[in-house]
Regions:
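Conserved catalytic core of sirtuin-type NAD+-dependent deacylases
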Residues: 1-252
Length: 252
């Protein structure tokens, strides 16, 4: 049996990479959960309230504007790049991310191998007709008018992220579950594994006997499970990129 992360990566050919906010904190984007996470100090706006009340829509857009202005220029880091190197080696079955920051795409992860299970903040989406577009114009409208931007059809525009109380997209879940059923290694990176149903995706593979590796500095909801093969509490940026480079024998 492999003894360390490098050996697990080197011996696998269909890796399911499941990522959470911890992979983007080195890029300056704060985590939502865990110690000091956004949801420890801020109450989220639920989707039903967004659709029902203008005050909730304004609160939501104000929060998203603050995030956009503070973190909209964030760039991928060595963790995102290491995942791209894994893909280029032909070892990635799917990258399933809970993150909405778009950094996997920016790093070069292929669209066909990426599931943004909680949506993306890189686009806005009409809640009536489903039209999607880049968000800059909507942020300018909100800054100027102080109210929720509208689509040409009259529907409410909202960043294309999945809000609390909003259903995940069935196609995204199906792609993620399909990869979990066919992979030969699960890497859970930077996630507290506390949000359902997304946290069930790596467990589908683990319960079928696929090796399950978790790397996260904080505790996760899966730490106690017998299916966990390797658990590392190290900083991701310190251990994951070097392990990938060694497994793939990349030049420094």
């Amino acid at each position: 049996m492999p003894k360390n992360l490098t050996e697990w990566i080197r011996g696998s050919s269909r890796i399911l990479v499941f990522t959470g906010a911890g992979i983007s904190t080195p890029s300056g984007i704060p985590a939502f959960r865990g110690a000091g996470g956004i949801w420890t100090t801020k109450k989220p706006v639920y989707y039903q309230d967004f659709m029902a009340m203008e005050s909730a829509r304004v609160e939501y857009w104000q929060y998203k504007l603050e995030l956009w202005e503070e973190h909209g220029d964030a760039r991928p880091n060595a963790i995102h790049e290491a995942i791209v190197h894994l893909e280029q080696s032909g070892r990635v079955a799917m990258v399933v991310t809970q993150n909405v920051d778009g950094l996997h795409r920016a790093a070069g992860t292929s669209e066909e191998l990426l599931v943004e299970v909680h949506g993306t903040g890189s686009l806005v989406e009409c809640q009536s007709c489903g039209h999607r577009e880049l968000p800059e114009a909507s942020f300018e409208v909100f800054k100027k008018e102080g109210k929720c931007p509208r689509c040409a059809c009259g529907g409410y525009l909202k960043p294309a992220t999945i809000s609390f109380g909003q259903s995940l997209r069935e196609d995204d879940l199906n792609r993620a579950f399909g990869a979990a059923e066919s992979c030969d290694l699960v890497l859970a990176l930077g996630s507290t594994l506390s949000v359902s149903p997304a946290n069930s995706i790596p467990m589908i593979a683990a319960r079928s006997g696929v090796p399950y590796v978790i790397i996260n500095r904080d505790e996760t909801d899966h730490d106690h499970l017998p299916q966990v093969t390797l658990r590392l509490f190290d900083n991701l940026e310190d251990v994951f990129p070097p392990a990938v480079a060694e497994a793939l024998e990349l030049a420094p």
